[in-house]
Amino acid sequence: MEFKEFQDLKLSALGFGAMRLPTVGGDPNGAVDEKLTAEMVAYARAQGVNYFDTAYGYHDGMSEVVMGNILGQYPRESFYLADKFPGYDLANMDKVEEIFEEQLKKCGVDYFDFYLFHNVYEKNIEPYMDEKYGIMDYLWRQKQAGRIRHLGFSAHGRYETLKRFLEAYGDRMEFCQIQLNYLDWKLQDAKAKVELLNEYKIPIWVMEPLRGGKLATLSQENEAKLKA
């Protein structure tokens, strides 16, 4: 396993995402197969993976519970856990404290190693930045209290939206997670986003490197283009 230095940490270059966990009977809408997931986590750890990523809405809220149950079997200092505030749903904006406390409980931890503003984009940037909801203020207090070790954000929005968020909070963001792969390099303007984040000296976390597996298998024509 390759490791990347982040401040005083050494993070596995490959993380374990808990958005698409195996389900009972392979039913995409079924319950998470916790036994199989535990086997996957054990295998990943054996290969050196130490970064695990979950979120409030994954698997209808059960991803956090399952990952908490499984990771709780290991020493807390042996893994890094990332979770996210679900601002993709505007109904959550006035519930930041309630949701954060719930997430800690579901994951069975006292702190998150990494915590993100989930999916900053055009429809939620206003409430994310609205002092009425106080999301940044609350999360910053949790960081100061040690309940969030590193604060960052993920982004699916346009370049202009990313720039605006950075202009407001770039001095407080320690990392950013963006969709980065050979398709989105141009399709979602990832190249320009990378350059912007580099200007702010904000480390980049890669998500969707294969777009959920869709980029793993190509037609012969497109495979030839990539190799050309």
Predicted segments — roles?
Residues M1-F79, Y138, Q144:
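N-terminal binding-site loop/beta-alpha segment at the start of enzyme catalytic domains
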Residues F6-K10, R45-A46, G68-S78, E101-D110, ...:
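Acidic (Asp/Glu)-rich catalytic clusters
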Residues L14-F16, A44, F52, M67, ...:
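Conserved, mostly hydrophobic/aromatic
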Residues R20-K35, K84-D94, K123-Y128, E221-E223, ...:
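Active-site mouth loops of central-metabolism enzymes
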Residues G30-A44, A91-G108, G157-E167:
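Short, acidic/polar
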Residues E77-D89, Y115-H118, I178:
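A short, structured active-site edge motif that brings together acidic residues
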Residues L104-P127:
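Active-site groove signature of glycoside hydrolases
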